[in-house]
């Protein structure tokens, strides 16, 4: 490879890394936005949670069609088109907010989400082409790390661009107005459009398309179908909690008198927990043989966890230490399941369910911290469920199974809506029974549903967990 080609790939990797940051940021931004939107449009919980439904329903409708688009037009062109969709949708929020039409607002979210789905469909495999095959896993880890950082930052952006603007005009609980929502979307639209134009102008290789089998062959694997539903439950629970958490902890007694601004920062900490947990997971599954080196790397992540807690929560040392303590517990529990994907998944699902139940049955800071730190235990669920769901499948079947699994990300549309209905019928605290049920199903899948039962065409095989 010439130096010119090598430099082109490096520049391309920089821009594709931005793609992962963008769809991580946009997704979490929309999830966290439901509470300010509820105030701005004077909505019920059910109506406000439609924000997530409008976003995540696209996974059910367009995950598989997006694959067809990528196959026809190529990865680079599909990525550029996805960015244009996101930018265009972002600019549509201006008229939607000006006329105060919530239906128009939801339509803009739907279009924006369509761009995100297209990006996710194209970007993951495209990263593997931007360099030697032997370093592809490292490139994927880098892009996923940027995605996790974006999910931490997005709620903080809401605090700085939406909540402070509202504080100036009156009481926080009643302050958010529709016009306060415009600026973030205009910034997102402008930045994404510039990146899309830049990627269009860069010369990058197109990725070859391999033939796939048919979907019927994938449906014979019971553990794959049960795994797809586990993804439905995982995404639904994670998004549902992330959506409800700020409204939940500002209720009298639950958050111990926490302001709306700090409550949304706790949402950022919830998503940061997933980032910390994934770093621990990467260390546990790394090629490093020395236990002492792994523990040293984990210590570095713990320091990072303290810094994240300190910066996110208004530079509070006490709250940073609390988050630090939960991060230690997360790492220690992860060691119990190292090398066995189903065991680690079972432990984390059980802990997540226990934390949600504890939060439901308590008040004050205990209710706050037990719900926020569930993010730490959501961290490894997606990769572990995915690895268990595709175990025993051949290469073409894995691609098809991936399409089915991506479709079931629609759980992010349905579970939060169910939580909204429960919150309106009772209160938001009791709505967390819905994610509890989700985590219990994931526990079932880890212990029972993930076991591979050979088909007639398939002899028994032995595989190892992720």
Predicted feature residues:
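Conserved MFS/SLC helix-loop-helix module at the cytosolic interface between two early adjacent transmembrane helices
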Residues: 61-103
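Glycine-rich segments within core transmembrane alpha-helices of 12-TM secondary carriers
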Residues: 135-166, 402-415
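C-terminal membrane-cytosol helix-exit motif in multi-pass small-molecule transporters
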Residues: 154, 158-167, 183-209, 334, ...
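Central cavity-lining transmembrane alpha-helices of secondary-active solute carriers
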Residues: 50-68, 268-280, 414
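Extracytoplasmic
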Residues: 11-43, 123-124, 154, 241-249
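Intracellular juxtamembrane helix-capping segments at the cytosolic ends
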Residues: 118-132, 379-395
């Amino acid at each position: 490879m010439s130096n010119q080609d090598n430099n082109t790939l490096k520049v391309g990797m920089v821009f594709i890394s931005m793609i992962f940051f963008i769809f991580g940021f946009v997704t979490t931004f929309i999830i966290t936005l439901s509470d300010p939107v509820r105030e701005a449009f004077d909505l019920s919980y059910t109506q406000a949670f439609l924000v997530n439904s409008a976003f995540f329903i696209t996974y059910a409708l367009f995950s598989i069609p997006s694959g067809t688009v990528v196959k026809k037009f190529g990865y680079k062109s599909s990525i550029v088109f996805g960015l244009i969709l996101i930018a265009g949708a972002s600019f549509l929020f201006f008229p939607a907010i000006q006329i105060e039409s919530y239906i128009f607002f939801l339509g803009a979210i739907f279009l924006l989400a369509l761009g995100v789905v297209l990006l996710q469909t194209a970007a993951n495999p495209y990263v593997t082409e931007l360099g030697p095959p032997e370093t592809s896993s490292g490139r994927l880890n880098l892009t996923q790390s940027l995605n996790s950082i974006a999910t931490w930052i997005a709620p903080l952006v809401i605090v700085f661009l939406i909540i402070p603007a509202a504080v100036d005009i009156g009481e926080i609980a009643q302050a958010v107005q529709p016009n306060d929502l415009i600026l973030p979307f205009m910034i997102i639209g402008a930045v994404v459009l510039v990146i899309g134009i830049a990627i269009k102008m860069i010369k990058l290789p197109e990725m070859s398309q391999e033939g796939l089998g048919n979907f019927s062959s994938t449906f014979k694997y019971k553990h794959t179908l049960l795994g797809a539903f586990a993804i439905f439950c995982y995404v639904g629970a994670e998004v549902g909690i992330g959506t409800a958490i700020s409204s939940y902890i500002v209720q009298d007694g639950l958050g111990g008198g926490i302001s709306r601004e700090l409550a949304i920062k706790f949402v950022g900490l919830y998503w940061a927990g997933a980032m910390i947990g994934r770093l621990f997971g990467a260390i546990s599954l790394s090629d490093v043989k020395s236990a002492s080196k792994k523990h040293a790397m984990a210590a570095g992540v713990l320091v990072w966890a303290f810094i994240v807690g300190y910066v996110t929560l208004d530079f509070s040392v006490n709250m940073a230490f609390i988050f630090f303590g939960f991060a230690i517990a997360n790492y220690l529990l992860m060691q119990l399941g190292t090398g066995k994907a189903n065991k680690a998944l079972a432990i984390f699902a059980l802990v997540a369910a226990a934390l949600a139940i504890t939060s439901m049955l308590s008040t004050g800071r205990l209710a706050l911290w037990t719900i926020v730190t569930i993010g730490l235990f959501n961290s490894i669920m997606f990769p572990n469920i995915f690895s268990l769901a595709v175990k025993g499948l051949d290469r073409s079947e894995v691609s098809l199974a991936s399409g089915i699994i991506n479709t079931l990300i629609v759980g992010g549309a349905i579970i939060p809506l169910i939580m909204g209905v429960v919150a309106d019928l009772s209160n938001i605290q009791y709505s967390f029974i819905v994610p509890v049920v989700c985590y219990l199903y994931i526990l079932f899948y880890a212990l029972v549903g993930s076991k591979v039962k050979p088909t007639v065409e398939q002899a028994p095989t032995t595989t190892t967990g992720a």
